[in-house]
Amino acid sequence: MKPDSLEHLVLQTESNGFRYYLSTDCPHSSDGVIADLVAGRVQPEIWFKQTRRRHIMSHDGLLIKLYQFHGFSDVRHSRRYASREVECYHDYLKAFGSMPGVRLPKLYGYFEKPFLGFLYRANGIIEEYIPDTRILGMEELSLVPPLFAHLYRKGIYHPDMQFQNVLWQPKTRTLVPIDYMGCNILFEPNWEALLMQLSWFLHAADVDDAHARPFMEEVLSLLPELRLDHEKAWSCIKALYEIPVETHQYHHPIFLPPELRRRTQPDD
């Protein structure tokens, strides 16, 4: 069943047991190419991932993520995948708004292959493919702090804010954040969420402290309203390096481990 928040997506077609809900500006929305790609009748221009459960492909301006579920244990958890991801995607785009030097891929659609009425044999999302992007290099790292400040002020929590999930398009000098699975809109700034996202980003970037700490300090300097002690904030980020991500990544509401919170919380 199409998520309630995606009322702007229209049931465009049904093919091979799949229902395709697409936006009016989705390329190939009416020529059958998307259904052919999902069914394997057309080979995509680029394969990014091809496993038993997950296919990620790009074709003519589209990025398609297909999740396939095998056996009942897979099927009963199927709602955690594309249906959840597409809702997160929609909420993220709506809350983020716009920002100079940052481009978010458009959300073009969602598709599903229902099973027993409320589960899925497969589902997936369709988004805009932004070409000529790559992983950030050290020389672009200094361009990212304003993005963190923007996420903080918009109350956006991105639990997979990894270094590899912020791409760089050299031709336009544009940052492209991707992969919004699990994103939550907190409706108000949250300093704990900010530090957790900084920790994951810097740890995944594998930069030394001589580059990582100035990065954090630049983010905090852009947020004068956030009265965090820089030494305490840095100590918190370093401590989070040692905690397995899954133990605190998806907590709702967002919070740090209690001892870290007590040691780090902003001055009144």
Predicted regions and their residues:
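Catalytic-loop of the protein kinase fold
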Residues: 153-163, 168
